[in-house]
């Protein structure tokens, strides 16, 4: 238990590495809960803010220098991965080569603006949607729509 945790943390510290402790039992219990509210209460009861799996994913993205951006349509919201520092043109190519070939611009709402306004429509109404060109550097959590013409 705690002896092994301490040894792993000490070793990782010497190697300048991050340690993320994950309990398979706790992760399993979290996944068995039905609602986000139940999960939140369970996590609070055991002194955690988020599941270990979420920490692992975030840490892996950081280690690999990756960001996530989102596209949203009437039927589907999808997360896409792009390298940190990549631009809108590169992001368009992640979705489809035609998006990249015929790239005109991208409509972008930042993650924080989206959360603050509660929806894409309300973000647009608040003037938080902007048009960006090929060289726009994609930020983590951006909600993007690509305009293209082939």
Annotate the PLM regions.
Residues 148-149:
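Short, surface-exposed secondary-structure boundary micro-motifs
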Residues 24-33, 76-145:
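Nucleotide-binding motor/catalytic cores of P-loop/tubulin-like NTPases across gene-expression machines
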Residues 6-9:
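Electropositive, glycine-dotted interaction segments
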Residues 24-76:
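Anionic-ligand-binding alpha/beta catalytic cores of soluble enzymes and soluble regulatory domains
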Residues 15-22:
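Conserved beta-strand/loop subsegment of P-loop NTPase cores
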Residues 1-4:
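Short, small-residue-biased leader/transition segments that mark boundaries at the very start
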